Amino acid sequence: MQPNDITFFQRFQDDILAGRKTITIRDESESHFKTGDVLRVGRFEDDGYFCTIEVTATSTVTLDTLTEKHAGQENMTLPELKKVIADIYPGQIQFYVIEFKCL
């Protein structure tokens, strides 16, 4: 069985599969993904595979430069998105946006 290339919290699985979540915001440890990469996606909690995505774009962002567009791509409000990012990556400022589509 192949390992997963990237994981998401299980609570995001349905939004990813339905196309409501089309970006992920990660820290430097996951800044290596490039446009065109095809990734196996698993759940963070159990590493269970649930889809394959293609990276369509990458960019950098800070908490202060997050926009309503980012929030919409995450299927959240901007305050929700800022809180989620701050909770997952406390004390960090620089992040990497990975835009994707399900294959």
Curated annotation (Swiss-Prot):
Tree of life domain: Bacteria
Reaction(s) the record says it catalyses: N(4)-acetylcytidine + H2O = cytidine + acetate + H(+); N(4)-acetyl-2'-deoxycytidine + H2O = 2'-deoxycytidine + acetate + H(+); N(4)-acetylcytosine + H2O = cytosine + acetate + H(+)
Leader sequence residues: none
Active site feature: K21 (proton acceptor), T24 (nucleophile), E74 (proton donor)
Which EC class is the enzyme in?
A: hydrolase
The question of whether Protein biosynthesis is a record keyword is answered with no
Q: Which family does it belong to?
A: Belongs to the N(4)-acetylcytidine amidohydrolase family.
Protein name in the entry: N(4)-acetylcytidine amidohydrolase
Which gene holds the coding sequence for this protein? Answer: yqfB
